[in-house]
Structures are given as structure tokens and as C-alpha cells.
């Protein structure tokens, strides 16, 4: 150890250094000057310290005295001006009825109160407004105080870090620029202190605040330094505590907006402020020495080393290279460690956690210039995200240059995080919620191309899930009304709430995917054409097809169709002037594309309508948008590039690319002669009419004209026969009323010229349609009138009907059975073609659903159990056209494999049943005429299934993996994807998960969802959506030409080739030849086959779906053909027969 200086030594400090030389020196300092030694002989630190303590004590005493005097004066004033209780006769009643006692002291009291409250209140309000962060002046003042505090702290750092610094210096004030600047800062701090003092409601607590102590220990010493002509380093380091106001200042400036950023800033500033303050006190105590020893043991240490020492000590590392040697310093460190260790252990991990999370999923989205992005929110899990990304980023999509931004409040788990990392070039994730506008701004929702809201399909409370998604849409639309929103909803009746959002606009691209509506619609269409649900599900899902020689033939054919998708593109100029069948034939046979529909532009209403297989009366116009079925988007480009001049002789369709010839004149010529093409289309239509029952509304007008002639020829007879009455009734429906269009059921249209009896009106009561003409309608019926007992059902001749096995109880949420029944009641079917629907389930649950079903005809209910074989036999399940197994119960969330236990048990129960070898007959048509290709609705006798395995059935599943339990004889791997399993390929199973692909399909092509909804729902229109949104259900209306014209629309059908429906089509005919014959002669558009799985087993009824087979495929006489056919107005209802 070096020598220690003591007062007994020479006065001139004989030591070469003013302090001892030892191993704990932090650095080498310059030799003290003679002036520094003389200055330190007589220390004046106590003057600076005493000024701070005196200022505080004086301020506190003055505040206490003021409070005591004010309290005494108030008590005395209250005693002097106590109002005497007035006598009863002195009490007066004023005009408003209240009582008061007149007193001469009233004005004086009021004046005293105003004086007392006047200047004090005004001064307090003025000071409070001046320092408030709500005003611009207050924000500026707070920011200025912080800047000057940091400036004062920087001056302290300079003074404490100077090489030959001393705790006390005798430099005169006028010779020290740092003291002069610091004094100016302290004058401003003094003014700010008085403003805060005036604004404080409690003066005592104000004096005890931390920032007040900072002012007490920094402002008075700067004035004392002028008087003493010396400076003391003192407690100026306390200005570092002003750093804790940084979060408030940044919030005033709207820089900090999220709770995590605010908390992170608070933790960092508190930690830094405490470290700097503690280091300042260690620096002061060590460099001063112990005061009770006469400051003979100072420890020279710089401020930077003090900060290092404090951090190392707080972290409990303690290297020992620097330590405290003075007793005061050690005592301080004992207490500082207790506080600092607790703060270090709690603050540092939280800071690290906030910084780590912020770096991962915080911040803002920074997209590339010119690159689109979408925001996906709602139910974000591994399953929902993986299904979405698998379809959205599929390789078959044409140049998907869109980034996907996921926004969710929960940090992704490891599985989901790994999925994001695999798609890191296309996907980003941010923590937050769309309910917060700050989070919406972080993901740049205003610049996004669309926002997609996903729903939890397995939610135990569907209505609550829909309400949450609707609130998300409201928040998004409130932030940016122009953003396109695509939202998933569980229940159909919740769609109405979206219409209440002012900025919700279907024309702008906003759309809702109702899972219950589409799920039940798919199942309903499978009742009309078994397997159609599988075909449509494969069409809007992106799947790749790869052939393999080891794969069975049936699976290759199925996978070839499963790889097909629905695309849209513009037809080239070479198609302009062609009729729709001509364009379809050319595209299929020459280009290998299947054209399903086109977009028709309504110039008057400036709207576009989708026409599905519209028939030969529609002519292709320039820039017509087509809806295609193809393997990829590149294949669809052939329709856009095809040129008759350049590509007419090309056999290899892969060579059809953009040609270099200039066809502008040809394009104009095609446009010019579009009128001539329409005339040619009329000739083609007349050529098609004798053979094809389907036709446009012009055909229907011809039928009406013939009926009017028949009616005129029969009016001379006194008694009308039944056929004449039927013709007259059709005339009554078609003729417009004198008062215009009427849809009200309360006022019958007049002016018909024919008198009908009440019995006749009652007889045709069940033939009415709803007000839009899109669905069959009947007057509301009581539930009890449609309930069948078991013995009643057994005695009823049920054949060709639909049996719905519904698992539900009284507390089950509504699934919207109307969405299942309405497609089966579409008006493009005649009344006698409607399949009777028998629901087997709980009556109390159906009572809740009945208010949406009582206007739909041909519905019966059997109050029983779908697992009861007696109930199933009573409804003739062996003679039904389709058995549907669905469940309304809340799925099991603990074990997903048990979610479908009832549906699986019901399916296996039916398959294990055996039936008598009975025959069921459909009503035979007595009129002669050509046989319709539809076959079954006109003339067919159906043999009942002898075994339950032959009963046509479709089962709804919640969990995809449970499909392995439906077929016990298949060889599907339990890990096989749903679309690769036999039950799904055969159309006997349907899961709601297949609808996940609709989100990306709708985003890339907003018209695709309209096309799918039109095919699936039977023709739901926006007008009908508004009617149902009112909550009153379907409304009936009298038939008018406008409403009846809505019947003329396309429908799905399944035709058996065993009935030889097409002339010239026999066994082993190519599919392409059958396609052309069906299209040209019958106006039917073939879209697929339903083929037997085992051709060698005559007892096997299992079939699989082939979507859009290749033209060279050979058909078999056992195949069923999926066709899109037009409405046939020639099939009329015969009142003399009963139909189910």
C-alpha cells in the first residue's frame, strides 16, 4: 500500500500525488496543483449540503404554517357567519317552489367566497394547464425540462471525468463556463419548480416527491457556489433520475403506442437512471473519503469506473478489480445491493423478454414497393394456417406474388413457428389484434390488397365465434372503409349482421363464406347427384396430379379429376360471335378445356351476371370472362391466346402461345357481325328445340302461347275438363296483373278473366313459389301436422325420398337446416320432381329449426333416433335416394376422434341392416313422347336395396381422420389425406375442412364463390339474402312473368347410361363423342362421370368420381354422367296424382 496523507505532514503535500498509491487505483491521475491543495485544506461541502436541507425545511415549514393559518381562519369565518335558523313566518317560497330564508349577509358571504376561491383557483388552474401533457405548451415545457436536465447531467459528467478533477474546486464562478451554463439551467428549473408547486393540490406531498428532492439538492448549491467562489461536485448526478420521464414524453409525442413498447421503455429508463444515480453516489463518497476521519482516505475513481462497479455488483458477479475502500461507500453499497439485486433480477429478464419478442413479432410490416400483401386474422392455429397456405401458395396458381401477413394476439407455438419459417419468403407474423387501430397500422391494413378473417370451424359456441369475427370486420372497416374483406362465418343467420356495416359492399369484393350454408348445400346437391360434393370440393381446392404406374386405375382417374381446379380468364377474339355450345365444343375437343359458364354484362344496370351453361341463344361477346375447369392456370391461357388463323392447324395444345399476327381487323369484324351471329344462334336454337327439352324463356313463351290458344278454343264449353283447368291456371300465373307486379299473398291478382273455385285454388296451393321465384313455397304449417309416428311412417309409401338422420338435442346449436332443404326446393325443378325429405331426429330441436322450414313443401318428421333400426325401416331407408347423416351437437374438444362417434355408429348401423327384396315404383308418366335424358324423374322403377351397404349415403364428419372408420373393407392408411380416401372419392363422406380452400379461391377470383354458391344453394340471390336477413323467412308471391323467368336456370343432374339417354352413345364410346352429342343435341354440359369401383363385382354399388375426364376415355354402360342442364318447361305437374 502507498503512503497515506495526514494533516500532521507538511502543509505543502509532500507526496507526489495528492492521494495514496495502491492497487485499487482505477487510473493514473495528474499531479495536483498548489491551488487545488490549498482549496482542499478547508472544505466547504457542508455549506452546499446545508443550503439544500435548509431550503427543504424552510419550504416545509412555510407550507405547514400556511395550512395551519388557513385552517384557523376558515374555522373562525364559519363561526362568525353561521346563519341563524329563520322563523317559520320568515321563510319565503320563491317562484320555482324552493324555500330560502332572507338574510342581509347573503351578498357578503358570496363576495367572500369569490375572493377566497378567485386568485388561488385561477393561479392553480393556470399552472396546471401550463405543465399538463394535454396542451401543446405543457408538452413543450415537459420536453424542455427533460432536455435541460440531460444537459445539466452532461455538464456533471464532464466535471466528474476531467483528468485532475477534485470533489471541491476553488475556481471562481465567473471563470467557469460549466458553472455558468448550469446556473442558467437551474434558474429555469427553479421557475418550473414554482409552477409545479402552484399546480400541486397537496403541497406537503409535492415537497416529498422524488423530483422535488432532485431540485432541492441541485438548485440551491448552484447559487451558493457564486457566493463561496468555489464549486462542489455534490448531488448533481440526481439529474439522471429525470430519465424516468422518457416514457411519458414519448407518449406525448405519439412515438410510443403499444403497451409492450411503453413497458420496455419504462424498465430500461428506470434501470439506467438507478445505475447512474448509484454510480454518482459511489463516485462522490469514494473520492471524498470519510468525513469523520477528516477525509484522509479518499479513493480516486472515475465516474465511468463507478458505473462499471455498480453494474458488476448488482449482477452479483463482483470481479474485485474495483471496490469501495471508504466506510461510507461500503455502508451505501450494503443497502444498494439489497435494492439493486432485486431490481436487476426482475428488470433484466423482463427487458430481455420484451426485446426478444419485439424483435420476432413486433415492429411494423415493411413490404417491398409495388408488391401486394394481404392480412389474415381471426382463428390462427397450425391447422388453419397450414390448410390456408397449402392452397394459397400452390404451384398451380399463376405467379402468386402476394405476401401473407398474419396478425394474432397469441405468440405462435413451435409447430406454427416452424411453418412460418418454411415459408419465410412469403409469410410474416405479427402479434396484435385487429381490434386495435395501432396494430392495424403496424400491418399496413390501409395498403393491403385484402383482409381475410378465419373462423374456428370446431367452436363449441358458433354464434359467439361469428360475433367475434363480425366485430373484427367492423374494426377493420372502421379503420379503412375501402379495404376488401373476406370473412368466414359459421351460421347462416349471422350473415345479416354484416349488412348493417355501412362500408360493407359486395360490389367492391367484400364477401362472406358461410360454412353452414355451403356445407349443407354441398350435401343437398349430393342428394340430387351423388358424389357431386366431392367433385366441387376438389374443384376449388388446389391439388397436384402425378400419374404412377403402381397406382390403381380407378385412383389414377380420380386423382386426374381431383387435380382439376376452377379458373377464370378472358376468351380470345376468335371466340367472338360463337354461341356458347360452339365455344364449349371447340374448347373441349381442341384445347382440352371445359368451359362451365361465362360472365354476361348488363350495360343498363352496369352489373355482371354469371350464366352457367346458358344455351345456344347466348353469343360470345368481346372481352367475355369464362369459367374453366383445368389442371393449371397455364392451360387456361390457351383460351386467351387461341387464334383461329395461327393455331387452327396445331395439334399439340402445349404449342398454343401468344401469336404475333395482328388481328385487330378480325376483332372488329367479329364485333361488327355479332348481330348476325345472334341471328344464327336463333336458327341453331330452333334446330335444337325438337330434340332438347331444355330451352330459354322464349321456349316457355311458346308453351304459354299454345296454352292460350287451347284456352280460347275451350271457353265455349260449359264445363271445363281437368286439363283445361290446368292450362288456365298456368295462364293465370303468367299473365301480369292490371296493377303491375304483385307479390303479396293477401291480395290476389285480378283481371284473369277466369273464375276458379276454392277447391281448385286449394288444389294448386302447393305449387306457389317464393317472392323471388327461386324456390318452391307453401303456406306455413304447424310442426305437429308434419310429425309422423312410427306406424304412420311405416304405412306411408315412401320411395325416392331423402332421409336425414339428425343427431341433436334440445340444447344443440342451430345448424340451419334451411340451407339443406332450400337447394332441394329450387324452382328449376317441377313440383313433382321434388324429393320428399324425412327427418329422423329430436322433435324439440326441430321445433327451434321449424320457423325456417315451415314454408318449404314436402317435409316430414319422425320423432325418433337415427340409431334405431325400427325408425329407419319405418321411413323405408332401403328405398331412399339418399341417406344423410349429420350432427348438430357440440363436438368433443378433448378427444377429436370421438367427435364423430354418433355419425360413424349410424353409418355402420345402416350398412349392417338387411331388407326384403321389394320393389319401389316412381309414378309413371302416361303421356307419350320422347324420353328425357334425365330418366328417373319421368319413368323409372327402383329396386330397393337388399343390404345396407347398397343404401346411398353421405356422412358429415368433423374430424378428417375419422373417415377411416366409415368403410371397413377399404385399405386406406389412417394418415392418408381426406381427399385420397375411398369414402371421400366415392362421395359418401364430407368434412367441413374442405371448405378452407374457399378463402384463397375467393381472394384470387371473387366470381368463383358466386359460381359455387349458385351451383350449391340452388340459386340464392342478393334479393333473397336481404329478405332472409329480415328474419321473417321466405315470403310467398303470386307468379308473374318476372318471377317465373327465374326458374329458367341451370341445374345439376346425374344420368344413368343404362337408360340409353343419348342416341349413338353406347358402351366403349369415347367420352369426347358423348360430350359433343349431349351438348349439341340435348343442350347438356357433361362435367364428369360416376363410375363403379369394382366393375367385375355385379353386387358392388361403390362408385367414385371422375371430374372432367379426358376426351379419349372410354365410357361404360354402367357409368353415371354428371351434367349441367337447363330448366325444362315442358314437364308439367299432373294434379290427379300424388307425388312424394
UniProtKB/Swiss-Prot annotation:
What is its subcellular localisation? Cell membrane; Synapse
| InterPro entries, A to Z | Ion_trans_dom (IPR005821), K_chnl_BK_asu (IPR003929), K_chnl_Slo-like (IPR047871), NAD(P)-bd_dom_sf (IPR036291), RCK_N (IPR003148), Slowpoke-like_C (IPR048735), Volt_channel_dom_sf (IPR027359)
What biological process terms from GO does the record include?
behavioral response to ethanol; locomotion; modulation of chemical synaptic transmission; nematode pharyngeal pumping; potassium ion transmembrane transport; potassium ion transport; regulation of neurotransmitter secretion; response to xenobiotic stimulus
Which stretches of the chain are intramembrane according to UniProt? 300-322
- Membrane-side (Cytoplasmic) residue stretches: 66-139, 200-203, 250-264, 353-1140
Name any one GO molecular function.
metal ion binding
The main location class comes to membrane
GO annotations of cellular component type: M band; monoatomic ion channel complex; postsynaptic membrane; striated muscle dense body; synapse
Q: Where does Ca(2+) bind?
A: 964, 967, 970, 972
**Annotated region Segment S10: where?**
984-1004
Q: Changing residue 350 to K does what?
A: In ky399gf; gain of function. Insensitive to the acetylcholinesterase inhibitor aldicarb, and exhibits locomotory speed defects
Asked if the record carries the keyword Translocase, the reply is no
Region ranges (Segment S7): 520-540
* Residue ranges of the motif Selectivity for potassium: 316-319
Observed effect of gene inactivation? RNAi-mediated knockdown in young worms (1 day old) fails to increase motor activity in mid-late life, but in older worms (5 - 7 days old) reduces the rate of motor activity decline, resulting in higher motor activity in mid-late life and increased life span.
The alphabetized UniProt keywords are: Calcium, Cell membrane, Ion channel, Ion transport, Magnesium, Membrane, Metal-binding, Phosphoprotein, Potassium, Potassium channel, Potassium transport, Synapse, Transmembrane, Transmembrane helix, Transport, Voltage-gated channel
Chain spans, region Segment S9: 797-817
Q: How is it modified after translation?
A: Phosphorylated.
**Tissues expressed in:** Expressed in synaptic regions of the nervous system including in both the nerve ring and nerve cords, as well as in the body-wall and vulval muscle. Expressed broadly in motor neurons. Forms puncta at presynaptic terminals of neurons, muscle excitation sites, and in the dorsal nerve cord.
- Where is the RCK N-terminal domain positioned along the sequence? 371-514, 799-953
Other remarks in the entry = Its activity is activated by ethanol, leading to the inhibition of neuronal activity.
Q: How does it assemble?
A: Homotetramer; which constitutes the calcium-activated potassium channel.
Q: So what does this one do?
A: Potassium channel activated by both membrane depolarization or increase in cytosolic Ca(2+) that mediates export of K(+). Its activation dampens the excitatory events that elevate the cytosolic Ca(2+) concentration and/or depolarize the cell membrane. It therefore contributes to repolarization of the membrane potential. Essential for the regulation of neurotransmitter release at synapses. Regulates longevity and age-associated decline in motor activity in mid-late life, by acting in motor neurons and through daf-16 in the intestine.
**Regarding domains, what does the record say?**
The S4 segment, which is characterized by a series of positively charged amino acids at every third position, is part of the voltage-sensor. The pore-forming domain (also referred as P region) is imbedded into the membrane, and forms the selectivity filter of the pore. It contains the signature sequence of potassium channels that displays selectivity to potassium.
* Family affiliation: Belongs to the potassium channel family. Calcium-activated (TC 1.A.1.3) subfamily. Slo sub-subfamily.
What protein name is recorded for this chain?
Calcium-activated potassium channel slo-1
> To which species is this protein native?
Caenorhabditis elegans
Amino acid at each position: 500500500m502507498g503512503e497515506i496523507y495526514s494533516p500532521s505532514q507538511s502543509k505543502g503535500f509532500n507526496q507526489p500525488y495528492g492521494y495514496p498509491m495502491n492497487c485499487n487505483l482505477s487510473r493514473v491521475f495528474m499531479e495536483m496543483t498548489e491551488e487545488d491543495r490549498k482549496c482542499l485544506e478547508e472544505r466547504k461541502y457542508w455549506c452546499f449540503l446545508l443550503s439544500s436541507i435548509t431550503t427543504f425545511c424552510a419550504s416545509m415549514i412555510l407550507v405547514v404554517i400556511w395550512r395551519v393559518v388557513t385552517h384557523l381562519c376558515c374555522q373562525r369565518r364559519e363561526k362568525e357567519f353561521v346563519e341563524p335558523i329563520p322563523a317559520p313566518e320568515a321563510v319565503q317560497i320563491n317562484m320555482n317552489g324552493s324555500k330560502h330564508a332572507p338574510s342581509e349577509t347573503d351578498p357578503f358571504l358570496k363576495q367572500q367566497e369569490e375572493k377566497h376561491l378567485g386568485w388561488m383557483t385561477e393561479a392553480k388552474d393556470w399552472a396546471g394547464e401550463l405543465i399538463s401533457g394535454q396542451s401543446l405548451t405543457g408538452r413543450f415545457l415537459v420536453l424542455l425540462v427533460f432536455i435541460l436536465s440531460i444537459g445539466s447531467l452532461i455538464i456533471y459528467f464532464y466535471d466528474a471525468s476531467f483528468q485532475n478533477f477534485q470533489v471541491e474546486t476553488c475556481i471562481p464562478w465567473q471563470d467557469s463556463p460549466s458553472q455558468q451554463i448550469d446556473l442558467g439551467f437551474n434558474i429555469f428549473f427553479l421557475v418550473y419548480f414554482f409552477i409545479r408547486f402552484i399546480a400541486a393540490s397537496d403541497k406537503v406531498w409535492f415537497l416529498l416527491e422524488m423530483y422535488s428532492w432532485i431540485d432541492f439538492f441541485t438548485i440551491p448549491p448552484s447559487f451558493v457556489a457564486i457566493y463561496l467562489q468555489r464549486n462542489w461536485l455534490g448531488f448533481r448526478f440526481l439529474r439522471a433520475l429525470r430519465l424516468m420521464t422518457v416514457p411519458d414524453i414519448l407518449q406525448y409525442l405519439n412515438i410510443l403506442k403499444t403497451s409492450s413498447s411503453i413497458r420496455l421503455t419504462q424498465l430500461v429508463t428506470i434501470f439506467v437512471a438507478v445505475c447512474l444515480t448509484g454510480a454518482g453516489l459511489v463516485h462522490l463518497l469514494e473520492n471524498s473519503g470519510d468525513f469523520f476521519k477528516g477525509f484522509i482516505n479518499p479513493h480516486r475513481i472515475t465516474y465511468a469506473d463507478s458505473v462499471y462497479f455498480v453494474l458488476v455488483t448488482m449482477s452479483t458477479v463482483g470481479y474485485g478489480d474495483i471496490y469501495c475502500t471508504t466506510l461510507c461507500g461500503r455502508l451505501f453499497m450494503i443497502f444498494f445491493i439489497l435494492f439493486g439485486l432485486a431490481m436487476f433480477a426482475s428488470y433484466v429478464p423482463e427487458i430481455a423478454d420484451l426485446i426478444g419478442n419485439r424483435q420476432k413479432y413486433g415492429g411494423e410490416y415493411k413490404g417491398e414497393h409495388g408488391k401486394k400483401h394481404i392480412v389474415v386474422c381471426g382463428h390462427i392455429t397450425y391447422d388453419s394456417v397450414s390448410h390456408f397456405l397449402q392452397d394459397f401458395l400452390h404451384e398451380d396458381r399463376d405467379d402468386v406474388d402476394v405476401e401473407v401477413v398474419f396478425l394474432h394476439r397469441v405468440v405462435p407455438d413451435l409447430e406454427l413457428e416452424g411453418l412460418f419459417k418454411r415459408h419465410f419468403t412469403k409469410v410474416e407474423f405479427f402479434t396484435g389484434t385487429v381490434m386495435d387501430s395501432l396494430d392495424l397500422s403496424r400491418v399496413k391494413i390501409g395498403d393491403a390488397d385484402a383482409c381475410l378473417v378465419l373462423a374456428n370451424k370446431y367452436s363449441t359456441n358458433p354464434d359467439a365465434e361469428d360475433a367475434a369475427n363480425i366485430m373484427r370486420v367492423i374494426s377493420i372497416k372502421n379503420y379503412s372503409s375501402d379495404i376488401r374483406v373476406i370473412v368466414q362465418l359459421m351460421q347462416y343467420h349471422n350473415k345479416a349482421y354484416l349488412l348493417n356495416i355501412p362500408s360493407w359492399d359486395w360490389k367492391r369484393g367484400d364477401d362472406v363464406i358461410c360454412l353452414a350454408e355451403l356445407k349443407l348445400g354441398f350435401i343437398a346437391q349430393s342428394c340430387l347427384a351423388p358424389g357431386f360434393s366431392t367433385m366441387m370440393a376438389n374443384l376449388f381446392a388446389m391439388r397436384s396430379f402425378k400419374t404412377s404406374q403402381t397406382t390403381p386405375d380407378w385412383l389414377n382417374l380420380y386423382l386426374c379429376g381431383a387435380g382439376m381446379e376452377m379458373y377464370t380468364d378472358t376468351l380470345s377474339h376468335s371466340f367472338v360471335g360463337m354461341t356458347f355450345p360452339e365455344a364449349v365444343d371447340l374448347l373441349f375437343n381442341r384445347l382440352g378445356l371445359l368451359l362451365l359458364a361465362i360472365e354476361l354484362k348488363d350495360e343498363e344496370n352496369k352489373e355482371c351476371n354469371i350464366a352457367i351453361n346458358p344455351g345456344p341463344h347466348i353469343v360470345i361477346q368481346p372481352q367475355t370472362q369464362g369459367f374453366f375447369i383445368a389442371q393449371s392456370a397455364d392451360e387456361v391461357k390457351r383460351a386467351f391466346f387461341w387464334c383461329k388463323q395461327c393455331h387452327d392447324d396445331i395439334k399439340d395444345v402445349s404449342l398454343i402461345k401468344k401469336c404475333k399476327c395482328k388481328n385487330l381487323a378480325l376483332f372488329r369484324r367479329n364485333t361488327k357481325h355479332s348481330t348476325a351471329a345472334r341471328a344464327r344462334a336463333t336458327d341453331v336454337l330452333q334446330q335444337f328445340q325438337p330434340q332438347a327439352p331444355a330451352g330459354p324463356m322464349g321456349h316457355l313463351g311458346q308453351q304459354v302461347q299454345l296454352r292460350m290458344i287451347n284456352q280460347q278454343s275451350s271457353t265455349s264449353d260449359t264445363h271445363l275438363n281437368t286439363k283445361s283447368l290446368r292450362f288456365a291456371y298456368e295462364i293465370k300465373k303468367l299473365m301480369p296483373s292490371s296493377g303491375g307486379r304483385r307479390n303479396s299473398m293477401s291480395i290476389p291478382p285480378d283481371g284473369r278473366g277466369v273464375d276458379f273455385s276454392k277447391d281448385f285454388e286449394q288444389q294448386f296451393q302447393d305449387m306457389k313459389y317464393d317472392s323471388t321465384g327461386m324456390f318452391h313455397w307453401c303456406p306455413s304449417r304447424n310442426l305437429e301436422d308434419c310429425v309422423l309416428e312410427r306406424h304412420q311412417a311405416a304405412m306411408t309409401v315412401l320411395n325416392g325420398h331423402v332421409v336425414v338422420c339428425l343427431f341433436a338435442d334440445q340444447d344443440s346449436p342451430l345448424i340451419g337446416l334451411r340451407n339443406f332443404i332450400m337447394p332441394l326446393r329450387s324452382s328449376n325443378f317441377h313440383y313433382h320432381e321434388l324429393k320428399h325429405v324425412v327427418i329422423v331426429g329430436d322433435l324439440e330441436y326441430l321445433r327451434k329449426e321449424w320457423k325456417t322450414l315451415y314454408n318449404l313443401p314436402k317435409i316430414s318428421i319422425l320423432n325418433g333416433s337415427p340409431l334405431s333400426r325400427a325408425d329407419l325401416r319405418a321411413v323405408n331407408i332401403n328405398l331412399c335416394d339418399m341417406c344423410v347423416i349429420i350432427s348438430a351437437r357440440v363436438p368433443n374438444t378433448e378427444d377429436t376422434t370421438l367427435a364423430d362417434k354418433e355419425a360413424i355408429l349410424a353409418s355402420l348401423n345402416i350398412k349392417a341392416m338387411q331388407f326384403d327384396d321389394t320393389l319401389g315404383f316412381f309414378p309413371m308418366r302416361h303421356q307419350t313422347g320422347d324420353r328425357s335424358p334425365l330418366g328417373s324423374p319421368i319413368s323409372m322403377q327402383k329396386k330397393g336395396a337388399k343390404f345396407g351397404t347398397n343404401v346411398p349415403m353421405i356422412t358429415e364428419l368433423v374430424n378428417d381422420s375419422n373417415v377411416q372408420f366409415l368403410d371397413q373393407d377399404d385399405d386406406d392408411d389412417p394418415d392418408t389425406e381426406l381427399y385420397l380416401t375411398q369414402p371421400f372419392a366415392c362421395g359418401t363422406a364430407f368434412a367441413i375442412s374442405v371448405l378452407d380452400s374457399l378463402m384463397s379461391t375467393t381472394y384470387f377470383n371473387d366470381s368463383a364463390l358466386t359460381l359455387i354458391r349458385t351451383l350449391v344453394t340452388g340459386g340464392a340471390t342478393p334479393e333473397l339474402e336481404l329478405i332472409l336477413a329480415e328474419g321473417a323467412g321466405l315470403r310467398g308471391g303470386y307468379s308473374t312473368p318476372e318471377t317465373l323467368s327465374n326458374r329458367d336456370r341451370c341445374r345439376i343432374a346425374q344420368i344413368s347410361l343404362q337408360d340409353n339417354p343419348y342416341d349413338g352413345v353406347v358402351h366403349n364410346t369415347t367420352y369426347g363423342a358423348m360430350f359433343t352429342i349431349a351438348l349439341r343435341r340435348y343442350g347438356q354440359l357433361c362435367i364428369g362421370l360416376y363410375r363403379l369401383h369394382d366393375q367385375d363385382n355385379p353386387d358392388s354399388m361403390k362408385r367414385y368420381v371422375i371430374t372432367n375426364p379426358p376426351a379419349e376415355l372410354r365410357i361404360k354402360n354402367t357409368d353415371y354422367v354428371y351434367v349441367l342442364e337447363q330448366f325444362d318447361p315442358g314437364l308439367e305437374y299432373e294434379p290427379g296424382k300424388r307425388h312424394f
